[in-house]
């Protein structure tokens, strides 16, 4: 029981630290729509796509690796709660176009990055 807990804890810690670092480095550049949250979500989308495709080709790999990367790292890196708070803040300030644009970029961008991650592994496997 300790292996899964440690895998998730390690992944979450690393993902959370990266998200925090991205926020520190990027959010001052454009505070109305903090880019750190967007970059964190896009990176997490790409990594989860790579992980899904990679783990599909590695069925004998210990399940703790999936927990570390997908549940832990990507879960700690991506941030729906911060995204939600930022969107609500934009709406409260009457910046409706910014809010709708941010929603579209976060959701579409994350989906595109997940597909790109899957495509990356598929491309490497076929090369």
Curated annotation (Swiss-Prot):
Fluoride-specific ion channel. Important for reducing fluoride concentration in the cell, thus reducing its toxicity. The keyword Mitochondrion does not apply. InterPro entries: FluC. GO terms for biological process: cellular detoxification of fluoride. One of its GO terms (cellular component) is plasma membrane. It is a multi-pass membrane protein. This is Fluoride-specific ion channel FluC. Its main location: membrane. Na(+) binds at residues 75, 78. Na(+) is not transported, but it plays an essential structural role and its presence is essential for fluoride channel function. It catalyses: fluoride(in) = fluoride(out). Coiled coil: none annotated. The chain crosses the membrane at residues 4-24, 36-56, 68-88, 98-118. Belongs to the fluoride channel Fluc/FEX (TC 1.A.43) family. It is found in: Cell inner membrane. Keywords: Cell inner membrane, Cell membrane, Ion channel, Ion transport, Membrane, Metal-binding, Sodium, Transmembrane, Transmembrane helix, Transport. One of its GO terms (molecular function) is fluoride channel activity.
């Amino acid at each position: 029981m300790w292996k899964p807990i440690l895998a998730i804890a390690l992944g979450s810690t690393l993902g959370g630290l990266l998200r925090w670092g991205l926020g520190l480095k990027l959010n001052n550049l454009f505070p109305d729509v903090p880019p750190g949250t967007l970059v964190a979500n896009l990176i997490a989308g790409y990594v989860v796509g790579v992980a899904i495709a990679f783990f599909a080709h590695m069925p004998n790999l210990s399940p703790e690796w999936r927990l570390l990367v997908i549940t832990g790292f990507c879960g700690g890196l991506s941030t729906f709660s911060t995204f939600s708070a930022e969107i609500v803040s934009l709406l409260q300030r009457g910046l409706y176009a910014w809010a709708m644009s941010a929603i579209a970029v976060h959701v579409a961008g994350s989906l595109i990055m997940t597909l790109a991650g899957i495509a990356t592994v598929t491309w490497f496997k076929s090369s």
